[in-house]
Structure formats: C-alpha cells, structure tokens
Amino acid sequence: MGTPPDHPRLSARLKIRRGGSFESFEVPFEQGQTVLDGLRWIRAQRDPSLAIRFSCINANACKECMMRVDGKTVYACTTRLVPGEMRLEPLPNKKLIKDLVTEIAPPDERLR
Amino acid sequence: MLRSDVLVVGSGAAGMYAAIAAARAGSNVLLVDRSLIGRGGATVMAQMTVAVAVGEEEPDHWEHHLADTLKAGRGLCDADLSQLLCEDGPACIREMDEWGVGWARRDGHMAQVHAPGHDRKRCVYVDFLNTGPAVSKTLRARVQRTPEIQRVGDLVVTELAIRDGMCVGAHAVHTPTGASVPIAAKATILATGGLTRLYARNSASINMGGDGYALALRAGAELIDMEFVQFFPIGHLAPRLVGMDPIMWDPFRYKLGGRLLNSEMKEFLPEEGRYISARDVATYGILKEVAAGRGSPHRGAWLSFQHCSEAVLREAFGPVIDRLAANGIDLTRQPIEVAPIAHYHMGGMRAGADMQTTVPHLFAAGEAVGGANGANRLSGNAITEALTFGRRAGERAAALAAKIPMPAIDPSSGFSSNRSKINPAAEIVRLQKLMNEHVGPLRTQGGLERALQEIRQMCGDLPAPRAGLDPEWMDLHDLRNMRLVAECVTRAALARTESRGAHQREDFPETSAAWERHQTIRV
C-alpha cells in the first residue's frame, strides 16, 4: 500500500512472548496497518528468527494467524496496530511450537 | 518414509480434486501441503466467479466458452488444454453442486453473470464473495470423507525424487520439527499453484512463490510461457482494507458496473460504466494514466460505485457492506483507489491433456500447468481449470499407479553445507520489489536486464533445517525457489521482443506474427 503524502508515521511497541520471556520491538506503521504487517516488518527488518504463522496475508481466509493480543484471541491480519504497547502471545490452549506458532492442524492431518 | 500410490502436493482445488479422483479410481493417496490442508492455497482466496458453459442462464455450449478462451489467449493457448477446461467444466461444476457448494441460484437455476471477454452470461458464483472459501470447504469435506486419502499438513516438499529419469516421489521437510521425510510414490501430482508471490503487489497467499515450477525445473521438466504473468487491473489500493481479498472489486463490477476514473474523474477506457475491458487492456490503461500524471493519489485509478444507492449495494453484497463500513468505507459517498496487482500465472509446467509433464510419472494440475490460457486468461477460468485439471490428473495418475510397482527412493535429500548469513525475509521483500518494478506489467530491455543481474546474485542455497521450527530456513527455502522462478520469468520476458496479452514491452509495443509461439525452459 502506498503512503499518502501527509500521513504521520506512528509507532507501536510489540511485546512478544518468545518461550519463557517477552521481547519488545519498536515498529513504525501507517494508520490502518495490522499486527500481521508489524510482525512481517520485524522479520524482514529486525529478526528473521521470529516464528509467526500465516498464509493468506490479508484476506482473513486461511485463519492461520490466530494469536492473543492484549489477552484477547484475535486474527493478527485483521487487528490494527495502535500507538503504544501491544502484548502478543501464542494461543494458550494449543501446544506451543515456537514463539507465536502453536499446533493448530487437526490431529488427523499431522505427520504420524 | 511415507509411501503411497499417488502423491498430491498442494491442497487447493486442483490438489483436492486430484486426490478425490485418484482415490475414486482405486489409488491410495497422500495429500500434502506446506500449510493446513485446504486452507493455504489460492482457491480459498478466490472471491469471484467460475466460468462454465452449463447454460442455465441462457443457452450455451462448451465450444462457445472455448472460442472465448482462445480469443482471450491472444493466439497462444494450447488448444487441447483449453478444450479440456471448457469441455469438462460443466461436469465438475455439477459435481461440486451435488457436493453442496451452494452456487447462487435465481428462479431455481444457477445464476450466471456476464464477465469481461465472455460472449454471454457464463459465470457461476457463491454469494457473498464466498466462491473460493465455499469451493475449498466443499472439497475439504469430500477429502475428509475419503478414507483412501491420507492428509498431512506442515510438510514442505523440497525436491522431487528422480530415478532413471522418472519421478518416484519426493523429499519433504516436516516444518514444526525440521525432520526430513522421504515420500515414495508411483505417481506424483504437483498442484502447487502459481508464482504471484514474486511480486510486491500480489493477491496471493504466502504459498504462491512458484514452488512447483522450481521443483519441476530441477527435476528436468519443461516450463512453458513463463513470461505471462496476469495482473488483475483493479486490485484494491487505498484506503487500507483488512480482512478482504484485494480482488473483491471484481464481483462488485460484475453486479454493479462501476466507473473507472482518472484524477480528472473521467473514464479513460471505452466502458461507460460497464465492466467490459479485458484484463490486459485495463491493466495497461491504468498504468498509462498514472504515467501521464493522471493517476489517483496512490498511483492507481479511482473506482466509483457512487451511482448505487445503499439499498442496491446491500441487495448485491449484504454483509460485505458492513465489513466495508468497519473499514471506514461508504461506497455511496466515496470512490476507492485500485491498481494492477499480480494475480495469476498463465505459464507453468508443460503438460499434455493427460496432465503428465515432460518427466514420466510426474503430473501437474491447476494453475501450475502452463498453456491453457495462452497470453491472457479469461475471467473465471482459474477455478474451472483447477477442478478439471485436478480431476484429469487424479484419474490419469491413478491409472498409471495401477500398472507399476512401488518404487524405491534414496532417503537422502541433499542440502547444501553452508548457511548464508543474509536475512532471507528481507531478501524476499527485495526480490518482490525488483520484480514489481522491472518484470511487472510494463517491461523494457534495460529494466529486465537489471532485474536479471540482481536476481542471479541472490542466494540460491538451501541448508538443512535446524531441529524444531526454523523460520529462517523456511525463508531460505522460499527464496531459493522464488529466485529460480523469477529468473525464468525475466529471461523469457527479455527474449520475447514483442507485446502480447499480459506481456507488454514498452520497447516492442507491437504484437508480432513471428512471435505467435511458445518459449520453453529446461535445465
């Protein structure tokens, strides 16, 4: 998406649970951008080892980017970034694989 | 080690239909996907219509559909493949209907709309903007109810296994653990979709980085027509929307017309509010307005539905109007901005009408196959192609598998020993920008040469993954495939010194009769 010329740059601090601790990243964004945009920015600009899961990017079709943001279960692709701190955690009721990725495949679609 | 009669790679519509057809023909099938089964491909994102000569809205015949497909293809369709798409389409669409997909109906028959490039009302759909999700869900349910199909997600195929020049299965990595998984198969079907993730502006899922093309190429298969990348002209540009596919304005235009306007709020295509311009023509038209300084603020065009009342909008799109409102958009009061977006790839693996590639026992299905749509795909042909080619590939792969023994495969998969220090996520973003800028809808020799030079310097090595989920390895995997496929597109675009359909050379603007031929690539 292009940037309108007169749009102010905003900043969010994404506090991300990575195993037993949290790691914070300052993420610049434009009004309207999503948590998933922010996470993809972190991977390309700061830390490619950050594990996130998504497939369709922005259409809310694949349903793979579900996570907890500030204690609520949401899709990262439809949750807008807001200035200030946002706390990101993996789904609490699924087996943790890494960082924000949990085991979400139906049991009969996993490698046996 | 996994074993199956038929291995299907990719679980969009083509892969799932192939799995069902192969199982029905007596094979046991392993259906694998790098994402979740039936959720990660292109199909689930399709919000538009499906072209098929079922003749429910007005009399039709598949030969009329074929004539329109060949015309849209600008002289480059493989007529056998186009015919398969058009002739088998009605049977597949009716089978999907029996399976409960829920095609929209009017007065007791399937509703069909008139899409650009078709000579009549031919396109079925599922309301509201739900065609792709409904197709995916229907096939997923059929797959789940077929005990001969084993489904495994989170399994990315890194290489095809070749013995004596024939495909004998594949090597895969289980992404959550990093474990290597060899798969022996009598027949293998690549239903991995296209390559639109190569572009910064794309309507694809993350899985559409051309995996199948790269696998096939490294296995010795031929690719065809790689220069023909379709840009969908009116992909959403601004204001930012979330939770909507950028292709969503297509069904809006089918139903409501709409006016495509430049910065002077004038129509620049001969449409007069009708949705009639072919995709290549509209893409070119928008980019030329932008180049002339008459684009919208974000360098696209305006699209206006301000002629429609709230009631008309709600009748046509129901809950979608609320989702737009949640995004701050009121179509009765404001136009939105649109611009071309990479959407589909006409080229792909070269295959016969039996869907077998040039490597024996390796089949392809869906968008991964090149040729059916020539230089420009007709609206609505993609899902039809996925269903018909998937069904055919599944049947033919099963027929082959019934005749041959289970092959043995070498368990080692051959990763490189070095792990590059680059940030592969950043490199992918760089590649996408490069492709969008120089190998997009408007091309020149200078731009293509610059792109080729940069692409060839990018990292093409793939080390073994670390134990556990290794996101950087996944990016290295994708970068390796995307880089190879990007090189194919760029080299083919550089060699084709003419303009035709989706391939537009600014330095060779004319269509040349001498170029009415295919280019193939093999390594």
Language-model segments: residues:
Chain B
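Glycine-rich loop(s) and the adjacent beta-strand/alpha-helix scaffold that form part
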Residues: 187-240, 295, 380-396
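Conserved redox-cofactor binding core of oxidoreductases
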Residues: 39, 92-179, 191, 235-239, ...
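An anion/pyrophosphate-binding glycine-rich loop and adjacent beta-alpha core
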Residues: 215, 221-330, 334, 396-403, ...
